[in-house]
Amino acid sequence: MSEAVSGKKRILIGVTGASGAPYAVALLRRQIGDVYLALSKWGRMVLREETGLREADLEPLVQKIFSDQDLANPFSSGSNAFDAVVIVPCSITTMAKIATGIGDTLITRSALVALKERRRLVLVVREAPWPTSAFENAARLSRDGAVVIPASPPFYHVPETLEELVEQFVDKIVGVLGFEPRRKWREEVLESRRPASEMSPEEGHALGISDADAEPD
């Protein structure tokens, strides 16, 4: 069922061969809706290398796991109701295929369906530096309605562990999908009677920021 019928969002998460598998695992663990998973061949390999997990370890977190070669799949058709496709991590090659209309895998095909049906498409792209073509492809997809998020985690909450850093970045993905993130930048300030500009650095740090007068880019 779609969100309008079941009350839950139906989401396909695609994992490709770019670095960044911990982001995908953290997102799956959020249990944000009726989530389905598609793994590419290289996505499986990177998942094992970066997290030590295999496909079977993720089965309890999702409704079903699909092969990326399964083009005879409900997500390949716009006639089936789903709310979003999230590709995390998304390789430069995968982004290029989607930008140029190549839907030769379940992940790329479902992304194209999301675009044509005006459903949410989120690409978490992990690559550095970007070639010029990647910027052009990202711009094209953005104009078509996709949300392109470079895999660039924030530091303004002063994470103490790698897990905290990953979770803070996943909050960004969750927010883009329309869910409430666990933590927001300076959220406490909204409930404070004193403006942030009047807080000392110590007070700002107590609120989870290193500089009370700093502003994000």
Language model features: what each stretch is:
Residues 1-122, 126-217:
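A cross-family phosphate/adenosyl-ligand binding-site feature
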